[in-house]
């Protein structure tokens, strides 16, 4: 499975990438620190899954979901993650495949990956 990560916290994004590659044998195609750079990665790679942080410096991740279909043609599943549980319902309403709360629990991530 091919993955792109968009998270403005460089260390969190790198830790997630390492976990996805080592524990789940996923191919992380890139990690962007903002939505604009993330769009470039999505256009270039057409991943199967996007791990998207809600709080980004240039746009709210929840608003970013609305723009994704033009870039992924509906083929990319979005897994959002956030430290704020009040965003969970909105993320699902915006068609997120799943939502994880930070810090990401590996048991919860196991469940998401298996789906």
How would you describe each model-predicted region?
Residues 10-30:
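Two-component/phosphorelay signaling modules centered on CheY-like receiver
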